[in-house]
Amino acid sequence: MSTAALVEGKIVQCIGAVIDVEFPRDSMPKIYDALILDGSELTLEVQQQLGDGVVRTICLGASDGLRRGLTVKNTAKPISVPVGKPTLGRIMDVLGRPIDEAGPIESETTRSIHQKAPAFDELSPSTELLETGIKVIDLICPFAKGGKVGLFGGAGVGKTVNMMELINNIAKEHGGYSVFAGVGERTREGNDFYHEMKDSNVLDKVALVYGQMNEPPGNRLRVALTGLTMAEHFRDEGLDVLFFVDNIYRFTLAGTEVSALLGRMPSAVGYQPTLAEEMGKLQERITSTKKGSITSVQAVYVPADDLTDPSPATTFGHLDATVVLSRDIASLGIYPAVDPLDSTSRQIDPNVIGEEHYSITRRVQQTLQRYKELRDIIAILGMDELSPEDKLSVARARKIQRFLSQPFHVAEVFTGSPGKYVPLKETIRGFKMIVDGECDHLPEQAFYMVGTIDEAFEKAKKIS
């Protein structure tokens, strides 16, 4: 470190996580420079320059015990974290420090968490499908390799369980490296996830970065960037990497807290005025280049189940596929509780997924939409008042609805049913048989919580 890097300043004000530090006027730190409290590992990140040598910083750690007059040193560079293979199999915090008690991370390469998004001419769009083994996702909202996917849902409809199943199915099949960023979620879930990865022997291919619910807003705001920086490094080395974020809403919420602490005027619903810019900075970096790809799966909490809330609404525009989880479907006991009429994907195009897949998807959605329209009539007048065609549509729709459910590997301990991975060909074949009327003679309960259509036929035999 040069002597210029060790310019010292003094704390002049502490308000919660916001710390004002005074430096000599001719050597003020730059925006996003990392400052370190003398005699401790506490890091502060410069957010504003107030003039007269004073900078306003956000504390990346607990501010307990801080007081005016303490000495702070300027590192003269942004927060940098270790990247590369030494991070695999490790749990790190927002600063890239290990928190798994397995010794230091022996990485020679570090990288700043603030990077520019790749230039337009470096991007590489892909239409190659990524099979997940989850019927409703592969059929209704297929994922693209190198694409961005959002799992939208309110509290308790299964975002994290769906995310875990996707990790289980894709990360194990994929065989490449994955990065998991736990942004403001429960520590218990982070612990469960670590042990899940360890038990399935894929931990040596996953880097875990956690900034959990109990941490200060600065940590939760920056931890997504820490995880993304690690994923970008693997991509720039020419690898195809999976990047999981749980939960992108907590990133926004941390931004709101920081914004309020910094004294900015709030915008709609109390969110920060820079919401779109902050989300754009993060999302534009999650992209595939000619060197390698980042396939990203992000859980997005929907406050009060309102998809028009500014936070989920801002996220929508950045995604290639949106998987919307519905409380109404969850209340029917159908899991995964994916809404097949609300969920979309840019891959739903006959030129990308093929004519057969496209037509089956649209026919399934038409049948379900017809059932949705008829539900009020059924509630008031009953099934008997429907025409024979409508009765048939309703029967098929109810079978489709149940066939969209599936037992998950990660939920085996709760359900007692072994998890099922259903290949895309089997998914298309099963739904084709239902919409073509080849399963009209089977009872609808035979389709609930099965994998392939053959299992539904076997279950029907047991029922009858």
Swiss-Prot record:
One GO location term (cellular component): plasma membrane
Documented EC number(s): 7.1.2.2
A GO term for molecular function: ATP binding
Binding site for ATP: G153, G154, A155, G156, V157, G158, K159, T160
InterPro entries listed in its UniProt record: AAA+_ATPase, ATP-synt_VA_C, ATP_synth_F1_bsu, ATPase_a/bsu_AS, ATPase_alpha/beta_chains, ATPase_F1/V1/A1_a/bsu_N, ATPase_F1/V1/A1_a/bsu_N_sf, ATPase_F1/V1/A1_a/bsu_nucl-bd
Membrane topology: Peripheral membrane protein
CDD domains: ATP-synt_F1_beta_C, ATP-synt_F1_beta_N, F1-ATPase_beta_CD
Source taxon at top rank: Bacteria
Protein name: ATP synthase subunit beta
Organism: Burkholderia lata (strain ATCC 17760 / DSM 23089 / LMG 22485 / NCIMB 9086 / R18194 / 383)
